[in-house]
Amino acid sequence: MSKKKEVIKFSLQLLAIVAVTTVTFTKIIIPVRVDGQSMYPTLHDEDIAIVNALSLERSDIKRFDIVVLKCEKLDKDIVKRVIGLPGDTLVYRDDKLYINGTYYDEKYLNKDYIAKAKIKYQTELFTNDFEITLNDDEIFVLGDNRL
């Protein structure tokens, strides 16, 4: 094979690699930077989360999944934890989560961090009390750091 053909072949292979890599990391595997402390201590400010854009079906979302949402109000992506699914009634009372009347232990929350944070910020509640019923097209998300 002539030198010119080798250069052309190499250039085409390199171009194909660049094209596949670009498509993969802009349309299929999307890196998202965590901005702020709202998911601490599970995720830290500036951590990178990888999103598989091919599996972004809303019906695949499960309770307590960590999700990336496009926040139009802030004009950026946000990382949060799914607490409520369509139709759920959520109640937080005295730092306890009830979903449709059933108590759920939020095992993903760091109990030591919560105890220290309550002392540091001189508060009795880590999650403010509330009650909400979701519509059939809504999910409810919270960060893991609720102070």
Predicted regions and their residues:
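Soluble "head" domains of membrane/secretory-pathway proteins
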Residues: 2-8, 23, 30-33, 40-147
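Hydrophobic membrane-insertion alpha-helices, especially the h-region
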Residues: 9-27
